[in-house]
Structure formats: structure tokens, C-alpha cells
């Protein structure tokens, strides 16, 4: 009887954890806003509906970096609980910037996605989706 109750508790916990998980992707380049930094370069931000913000800076970037950029890769850093997304210019030239979202609780890759460990590279942002709480 106790083992049946314990199994039931584990099943309910698994369902609740799954229900609380959200699926996210890096922000599309079109949703990222850039703001000039005082000493040159730009700050990049994309807001989420829950109030959190993807953010990053490139002190060497000209204004054209955002307009020319497409998604390149995503990586998860367990030590800082952060997901960083990198965007690059045409033909992967030096025009690049990154935005980071942290903290990310309960991060996990999506098995059908293109993640290799904590790194995902594909031109399609959706293929680098991840789950979190």
C-alpha cells in the first residue's frame, strides 16, 4: 500500500513539474531593440511578456549590426543559469552580438531539437528551443 501511495506521489509531482515547464527560444532579430552606448557601440534588448529581458552589449558595433544580423546559435551556461543567443551578419562575418537571459531555472534541451549538450547551432531559432520553469 505504501509503495502504491509513493508511486502516486511521484506521478503527481512529475505531472506538476511538466505543467509548470515553459518552452522558449531566442528572440527573433526583428524583436531586438538597440540603444547607442555613451562611448560607442550598442546595447541590445528584447522584452518577454513575463517582464524578463534578453540583454547584451557590443561596444564596437555600428548601427548596421542589428539590421544585418540573423540568429546563429544558443548556449546554456549552468554556472550562471543563463542562455546566451548569438546573432551574426551575412556570411558569418565579424558583425555579431549576443543577448543573454538569466536566471533560467530548470533548463533542459528539447530532445527533438538540434542541441548538442548545452550548445545549439542552426539558422532556424525554433530548432534551438529549450524548456525551463
Question: PLM features: what roles do these ranges have?
Answer:
Residues 1-7:
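Positively charged n-region of N-terminal signal peptides that target proteins for export
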Residues 7-14:
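Bacterial N-terminal signal peptides
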Residues 20-133:
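Mitochondrial intermembrane space
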Amino acid at each position: 500500500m505504501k509503495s502504491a501511495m509513493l508511486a502516486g506521489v511521484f506521478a503527481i509531482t512529475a505531472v506538476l513539474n511538466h505543467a509548470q515547464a515553459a518552452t522558449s527560444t531566442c528572440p527573433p532579430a526583428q524583436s531586438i531593440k538597440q540603444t547607442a552606448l555613451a562611448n560607442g557601440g550598442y546595447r541590445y534588448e528584447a522584452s518577454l511578456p513575463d517582464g524578463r529581458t534578453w540583454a547584451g552589449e557590443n561596444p564596437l558595433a555600428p548601427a548596421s549590426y542589428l539590421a544585418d544580423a540573423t540568429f546563429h546559435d544558443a548556449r546554456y551556461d549552468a554556472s550562471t543559469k543563463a542562455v546566451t543567443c548569438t546573432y551574426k551578419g551575412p556570411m558569418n562575418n565579424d558583425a555579431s552580438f549576443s543577448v543573454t537571459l538569466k536566471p533560467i531555472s530548470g533548463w533542459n534541451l528539447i530532445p527533438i531539437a538540434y542541441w548538442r549538450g548545452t550548445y545549439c547551432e542552426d539558422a532556424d531559432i525554433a530548432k534551438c528551443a529549450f524548456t525551463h520553469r
